[in-house]
Amino acid sequence: MKLLVAAVGRWRGGPERALFDHYVGRLKGGLAVIEVEERRPLPVAERKAREAELLLAQLPPGAFVVALDEHGEAWGSERLARELDQRRLEARPAAVFAIGGADGHGEALLARADRKLALGVMTWPHMLVRGLIAEQLYRAQCISGGHPYHRS
């Protein structure tokens, strides 16, 4: 199963990128990034709807979509590993972790999401979230493979 991050916004250099690259280098099968961007100055609701439209257009058919959302569930690493293992058993072609823009996801993306995941109650910079997701995907892979990286 292919792993993807679909994100609003473009990469900049810096330590966030280094963190992401570090864990992607450890992941078997890698982690692809799809970036979309709406540059026109639009009202918040219109921008969120447009960003959702752009993200949805990039999703592989049949993908398991996890929207990173402040109102989502908080999972432990073991839950993430179980969710991904289950999607592999279902022969899903991809698992996509969608990161919205500064104002969050549009309704269309949230409606399409199979799960909504919160990374706790704190607000995180969007570029740092990419690194956090990469680390958690590596950790989930280790849990599923019985590797000692993760300690319960």
UniProtKB/Swiss-Prot annotation:
- Annotated EC: 2.1.1.177
Query: Which reaction(s) does its UniProt entry say it catalyses?
Result: pseudouridine(1915) in 23S rRNA + S-adenosyl-L-methionine = N(3)-methylpseudouridine(1915) in 23S rRNA + S-adenosyl-L-homocysteine + H(+)
Keyword Ribonucleoprotein present in the record's keywords: the answer is: no
Cellular compartment(s): Cytoplasm
Looking at the record's lineage, which domain of life comes first? Bacteria
Record-level GO cellular component terms? cytoplasm
Q: What is its main location?
A: cytoplasm
- Gene3D superfamilies named in the record: 3.40.1280.10
Record text on subunit structure and interactions: Homodimer.
- Name by which UniProt lists this protein: Ribosomal RNA large subunit methyltransferase H
Q: Which organism is it from?
A: Rhodospirillum rubrum (strain ATCC 11170 / ATH 1.1.1 / DSM 467 / LMG 4362 / NCIMB 8255 / S1)
Supply the gene name.
rlmH
